[in-house]
Design a protein with these regions (language model features):
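N-terminal export/targeting leaders of redox proteins
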Residues: 1-366
């Protein structure tokens, strides 16, 4: 193809063309990447929130891209209430099938709330007069549960600002919320002395070898009416274990519980704990108190409102192993965010859901 003299010259003067080619390629790629970053921004830029004293490495780091407005925020339907006039007719006196928890709501505001609830839950005939489906029966309990949380658990759901909860906080437009959980029981064959609830990757264990039953351990009462307590083994190596002290099994159960918190809120350990003194409860962050109240809040809602629905839900809505009701926990509301819906104030326009067994306060709209 080439003249003989050209081939002879190349053989007499060998040249390594790969080195320069690689150098040119690397330089060109670097220029291209730099131009893209200038034009489109740093795709892996991060922001940090300090959670403890300076110099202790206590911060929660997030990708800026993940801090964009949560997409579910756009799906939240809301409207201002109608301030009822003196002597306004109450829905429970004028309409059929009004939940007792909404006995103090006027006709206009009841119809406004029902329309919003149908959007929040994705159930088009929710609370339809004459409709006695299980969804309507569940709605009766869930309305009361929502009111209970907003009125009695403001220290958790309004710890930093007025936020509150509505049906949409969990449902996000779906009849069954995401991130509910069921009892799972044994997930493995066990060896002597070890429970068969771990060492198998499951969604419940967040794809770790940790126990899969931590939610039922800490959030449901045992046969003696007690809840599991977070425990870790002695900090001293080879320390003698007194009777009643936590074993490594309790430690792993606690780690599974903490891992669930981290995944539910999109945070790390130092969001609640001091990284230099995990063992010292006097050095925790303010978020630790908010989380502790949240645990008790969930325990109460499960016991009072969720578990009694076992006789109401159809078989296809029950758990695959124990036929138990779908249950809520941190991830059901938070869904990976430190505050559900990025801290959107969902209760501002819904005073009907902010009080339990009381008259809604419409003074802010007068």
């Amino acid at each position: 193809m080439f003249p003989k003299w050209f081939d002879k010259w190349n053989s007499d003067n060998p040249t390594n063309i790969f080195g320069p080619a690689i150098a040119v390629g690397v330089a060109g790629s670097a220029v291209f990447v730099a131009a893209m970053i200038v034009a489109w921004g740093q795709p892996f830029a991060t922001e940090s929130m300090q959670t403890g004293p300076r110099g202790t490495g206590m911060h929660v780091q997030e990708f800026v891209a993940d801090l964009a407005e949560y997409p579910d925020v756009e799906g939240f339907v809301t409207s201002e209430p109608v301030v009822p006039a003196d002597g306004a007719a109450m829905a429970i006196d004028e309409l059929e099938g009004v939940p007792p928890a909404l006995a103090n709501v006027s006709v206009e505001n009841y119809e406004r709330l029902v329309e919003a609830m149908r959007s929040w839950t994705g159930i088009p005939d929710l609370l339809e007069p004459g409709n006695d489906s299980y969804q309507t029966q569940v709605a009766y309990s869930m309305i009361e549960m929502t009111q209970n949380i907003n009125q009695n658990w403001a220290a958790h759901v309004q710890a930093n600002a007025e936020v509150g909860v509505t049906c949409y906080t969990c449902h996000r437009g779906q009849p069954v919320p995401n991130n509910v959980w069921f009892r799972v029981g044994p997930v493995n064959s066990n060896a002597a002395g070890w429970p068969a609830i771990q060492n198998r990757v499951t969604m419940a264990s967040n794809f770790t070898s940790l126990p899969s039953t931590y939610l039922e351990h800490f959030l449901l009462q045992d046969e003696n009416g007690n809840y599991g307590v977070a425990q870790v083994h002695d900090l001293v190596s080879r320390a003698e274990n007194p009777p009643g002290s936590p074993l490594i099994q309790q430690t792993e159960m606690t780690y599974a519980w903490m891992n669930y918190f981290a995944n539910s809120l999109g945070v790390n350990c130092v969001f609640c704990h001091n990284s230099r003194a995990f063992y010292d409860p006097t050095q925790v962050t303010p978020q630790w108190s908010t989380a502790s109240l949240g645990i008790i809040m969930v325990q109460e809602q499960l016991e009072q409102y969720i578990l009694p629905l076992a006789d109401v839900l159809p078989a296809e809505r029950l758990g695959p192993i124990y036929a138990d009701v779908p249950k809520l926990a941190c991830r059901t509301c938070h869904q990976g965010e430190q505050q559900p819906l990025n801290g959107l104030n969902v209760i501002a326009n819904w005073p009907e859901l902010a009080v339990l067994d009381d008259v809604p306060d419409y003074s802010a709209f007068e």
